[in-house]
Amino acid sequence: MTDLSDSSKLVYKAKHKIRFVTAASLFDGHDASINIMRRILQASGAEVIHLGHNRSVDEVVSAVLQEDAQGVAVSSYQGGHIEYFKYLIDLLRSPKNEAAGARVQVFGGGGGVVVASEVKELQDYGVARIYSPEDGQRMGLQGMINDMLARCDFDPAVKEPKTLAQTITALELGILDPKTIKPKSAPVLGVTGTGGAGKSSLTDELVRRFRLDQGDALKIAILSVDPTRRKTGGALLGDRIRMNAIHGDGVFMRSLATREGGSGLSGAIGGAVAAW
């Protein structure tokens, strides 16, 4: 039975806004555990970009960099965890991505599939933490989430934003004045509707047709906004899970939380549109 001590029930209070990407690894349909973890992350105040199951390293890294997340959590029960997590670290730390990816904390779990010697091997390689069944018994679910949040509780902003993702982060944090950004002339289309109306599916279909019709000649940006929970400050940013046509150099996607109760848009949306 899981030992939930008093300390493990206390929710970590972060000093900064923390963003996490969560997913189950490639060829892996076991998403029950990662769904539990992303729900607790959200309930603990994190903004969670959930990708769902069967996600490649390329897809995960692309999401982490475009979303400018501090952490990524992946569950892997399909037996290929050594190769998967090492490749994930390699891509994040590659010269191409080093400016944004070097700081990203990588977390994983796979129950009894990942044995103790492999846990050590992966953590020695650069994974921040692989949580074992013994960790779950000792720390409890909230205890593991608290550990993840504490390791990712650092200022996500950089002094001189070099990427679009970093620019949007600076806009969200209010340290960059949107008036200093010269608006581009790209046409802007807004899609709105109630939850479950099909906004993400429609957007994905539009992107797919633009790419097919124009032969990937266009550069396309998608800015997706979801509400922040007033009580916890967390948010589930789940539109990426419906996007199948965004994978490629010409498409950028960023998920934003409203961060303000009662608002339907993020305060950074105007600056983000101008920055593109």
PLM features: residue spans?
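Extreme N-terminal, non-catalytic leader segments
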Residues: D3-S7, L141-V188
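ATP-binding Walker
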Residues: D28, T194-A197
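Conserved phosphate-handling catalytic cores of large alpha/beta enzymes
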Residues: A116, Q123-A165, R259-G261, L265-S266, ...
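Nucleotide-state-sensitive switch-loop elements of NTP-binding domains
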Residues: E172-A186, A197, L202, L206-W276
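Residues at the beta-strand->loop junction immediately N-terminal to the Walker
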Residues: A23, T192-G195
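Cofactor-cradling patches in redox/metallo enzymes
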Residues: F27, I34-G143
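Gly-rich Lys/Arg/Thr-decorated short loops/hinges at beta-loop-alpha junctions or inter-strand turns
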Residues: A14-V21, N35-A46, E67-G71, G101, ...
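Non-catalytic signal-transmission and effector/linker regions of two-component phosphorelay proteins
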Residues: M1-I18
